[in-house]
Amino acid sequence: MRAVVRWSLCCAGLAGGLSPLTAQAWTRIGETQEVTLFVNRKSIERDDNIRRVWEMQDLKTPDAEGVRSRRYLNEYDCTYKMHRLGQMTSYAGPKLTGKKVAEVKEMGYWRKIPPNGVFVLTYIAVCVE
């Protein structure tokens, strides 16, 4: 019976149009003048020295392409202090709302994490123990 109730609640939430923001547990991890960065702490995966985590950027103003928010998978190499983004979906509205502006499925190139950027905050959260 409990399984049926849980399944019903799950489906009711999906049918009710839960946005990606409410469907996932986003935690604010940092902010600059341009962007607020959120992570889904429940999504962290560990594979040796690699950490994978879903992140969301909420821009204060739309960028040149009209993007106001984006969600993506960020992989962190804890040994070499590098990261790469992929599976990115960008939206015209704040917090993953509005029209879908762009979508990229592939993972990007590995890049060094800038010491004063927002990605260093997630690196510390997922790699430093």
Regions found by a protein language model. Name each.
Residues S8-G17:
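Bacterial N-terminal signal peptides
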Residues S19-E129:
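N-terminal secretory-pathway/extracellular module detecting exported/lumenal segments
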Residues M1-L9:
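Bacterial N-terminal signal peptides that target proteins for export
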